[in-house]
Amino acid sequence: MSDRIAVLPQYLLPKQALTSFAGRMASARAGQLTTAVIRRFVARYGVDMSEAANPDIASYATFNDFFTRALRPGLRPLADAAVVCPVDGAVSQIGPIEQDQIFQAKGHLYSTAALLGGDAEMAAQFQDGSFATIYLSPRDYHRIHMPCDGRLVRMDHVPGALFSVNPTTARGVPGLFARNERVVCLFETPLGPMALVLVGATIVGSMATVWHGQVNPPRTGQPRRWDYGDREVVLRQGDEMGRFLLGSTVVLLFPRGAVQFMPGWEAARPVRLGEAMAHRCGI
């Protein structure tokens, strides 16, 4: 079965309603039922609870508490690199931005402007730059950390669809990451501007950042923007910057001539938070 045929049911599903329902259920305090659901999830997806700061499944009051669990201190040491991996997951795609085009999958490209909510001025900063797309599976740790030091410039919530973001859907839905709901975070870094985009998906109940809290819901259907030029929101490499309540994808954009990705960083490669991702060009 081709990927395009495999994803056809997703066009018919009431994705917004499913996501709203999943969000309510994930935040519900249902006692033993919550514990049973978490146990089932751990078994189904092979979640390694020995990595969790709190491995006691029965102690989580809600599914969201479990899903956004912290790791044991020191479990993901930071490599000595200009850019470290911001999440646990697997590389979806990685490489150069060809003018303004980002590679999604064979036969599928999308533009930086589309990803960034139609902001051509922001997109121009990444012309002929570099990108990395990392998929977080259900079993992964779902907090996002800073790949390098950065000062927050602005944050945009871009409404959109809620397709799944698994590899099959990435191959079957054109412009997937520029169609789905997303939170765009623009930072000024020692490498120049960096965009860190949190992409939503089916049953991703919400996305949150450490400086704002929960960004969505509400889902107003209208783009929202927060400017931080007059506020000092500075995060260091490795600091937590946000989290998904149910899993999804992050997309990183760097300007031209800023970074060179480490050897072996290619599609389908499993990656872990803190490992060396890229070095600064010219060093």
From Swiss-Prot:
Site features described as Cleavage (non-hydrolytic), chain residue numbers: G247, S248
Catalysed reaction equations from the record: a 1,2-diacyl-sn-glycero-3-phospho-L-serine + H(+) = a 1,2-diacyl-sn-glycero-3-phosphoethanolamine + CO2
Keywords: Cell membrane, Decarboxylase, Lipid biosynthesis, Lipid metabolism, Lyase, Membrane, Phospholipid biosynthesis, Phospholipid metabolism, Pyruvate, Zymogen
Modified residues (Pyruvic acid (Ser)): S248
GO molecular function annotation: phosphatidylserine decarboxylase activity
Main location: membrane
Bound cofactor: record note: Binds 1 pyruvoyl group covalently per subunit.
Required cofactor names: pyruvate
InterPro entries: PS_Dcarbxylase, PSD-B, PSD_type1_pro
Cellular compartments annotated: Cell membrane
UniProt xrefs under Pfam families: PS_Dcarbxylase (PF02666)
UniProt pathway: Phospholipid metabolism; phosphatidylethanolamine biosynthesis; phosphatidylethanolamine from CDP-diacylglycerol: step 2/2
EC assignment: 4.1.1.65
PTMs per UniProt: Is synthesized initially as an inactive proenzyme. Formation of the active enzyme involves a self-maturation process in which the active site pyruvoyl group is generated from an internal serine residue via an autocatalytic post-translational modification. Two non-identical subunits are generated from the proenzyme in this reaction, and the pyruvate is formed at the N-terminus of the alpha chain, which is derived from the carboxyl end of the proenzyme.
A biological process term (GO) from this entry: phosphatidylethanolamine biosynthetic process
GO cellular component: plasma membrane
Active site: D88, H145, S248
Topology with respect to the bilayer: Peripheral membrane protein
Assembly, per entry: Heterodimer of a large membrane-associated beta subunit and a small pyruvoyl-containing alpha subunit.
HAMAP family: PS_decarb_PSD_B_type1
Family, similarity comment: Belongs to the phosphatidylserine decarboxylase family. PSD-B subfamily. Prokaryotic type I sub-subfamily.
Protein function: Catalyzes the formation of phosphatidylethanolamine (PtdEtn) from phosphatidylserine (PtdSer).
UniProt cross-references to NCBIfam families, sorted A to Z: PS_decarb (TIGR00163)
This protein's name: Phosphatidylserine decarboxylase proenzyme
